[in-house]
Amino acid sequence: MSDVGVSTKKSEDFSEWYTEVVLKSEMADYSPIKGCMILREHSYAIWEKIQEVFNKKIKETGHNNVYFPMFIPESYLKKEGEHFEGFIPEVAWITQGGDTPLEEKLAIRPTSETIMYATFAKWIRSWRDLPIKINQWCNIVRWETKATKPFLRTREFLWQEGHTAHATAEEGEAEVMYALGEYRDLVERYLAIPVLVGKKTDSEKFAGALYTTTMEAMMPDGKALQMGTSHNLGQNFAKVFDITFIGEDEQKHEVWQTSWGITTRLIGAVIMVHGDDKGLVLPPKVAPIQVVIVPIPFRGAEPEAIAAKAKEYFTFLKQKGIAVVLDDRSEYTPGWKFNHWELKGVPVRIEIGPRDLKQQQVVMVRRDTGQKSAVKEVDVVGAVEKMLEEIQHNLYAKARVDLESKIATVQNYQQFQETLKTKGGFIRAAWCGKATCEAKVKDDTGATIRLRPFEKETPISPCVACGEEAEEMVYFARSY
């Protein structure tokens, strides 16, 4: 059982607050393996909600789930040179099985392009075999050397990876934007987190891709968090793995490919963006428990009648498809229960005491604002549904205001450095397009170009780093 109460204020020590909320709300725990975490029931239930929403989206457009082995031969990884170089520092290797050394080292899946695409070469023969549109929910291992943080950076994490193969470049480009659009809808409409979208620079793109598209969120401490990416792989992997097909023109062609993914770091973003000094604040659309009912019996004040009425409300709400819990445990006080469920981030609390029973009402409490309201018995179901909608909307609106307050436009390097030091957040600035200037900013400040907007914006000044003519406006930030 959780130790109720968060002792660190979000505004005073954000990092410590985050860790305390993760542990005390029973979202995760540390494991015996350094850098690996245990996802507890509460966080895994949120991941299941994300899976449910995203599976529905992609299955409607002909994508199907598969599962490939987590072991990848070293020779497969090495086939695409840029891809291999990008992942080699983080690969965990298996060198023996039992007491027997392996003839070839096996990588524990850092991503699945290579093992999947070797198989695509067997599956695809004709234009009739296209497109291939598959998705995999699995674990990934990347042996991080940086400091780890639950959900945000761990050596093992869960993710979804989509992989597609198409007959034309245009189909591939459309797929890249389709995936990014579905990610944005998932994150903004369900997780209530606003994002910026655009392209990565060549130095920040996925290893082996033509280009990478991204969605980036801003955390309360002024650091960006990459929420999901969608990659246009072009024909790079098709050339390496000989993925070809005979087209309608009876000629041989290489396929065009995409890959795209989101991870359990989305859960970390929900905690950071919406949480407060009492603990989690979960968006109703992904909250494992949307409503908790707490009976408040007093001695000599009809405890049986209060309990019966609480069960009645529980049944009504459950029949309406609302995720509701009745907390009628006698070993805990109502006050303890209030704190416990607030820490867990449950969006709505319903209280029923003797006076409420007499007046044929309940008291409803919003987790996001703490606002209390008396609701007549006949109106409870409708009031709960309305309150859940209002909370979802309010969480997004608050996060949108916070995001906009953390975007600053600067015209020179001095302004850039001062803004980064005092405020953090996204810094919109002009860039000449040179990787040397991008590297200089990163070396000097730790900030990287998080994205280049899809619609090129006319530069408002010379390049923020070198002072020469700029090509476009980009968004810089420090990041997780």
Listing of model-derived features with the role each one plays in the protein:
Residues 1-480:
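NTP/phosphate- and nucleic-acid-binding module
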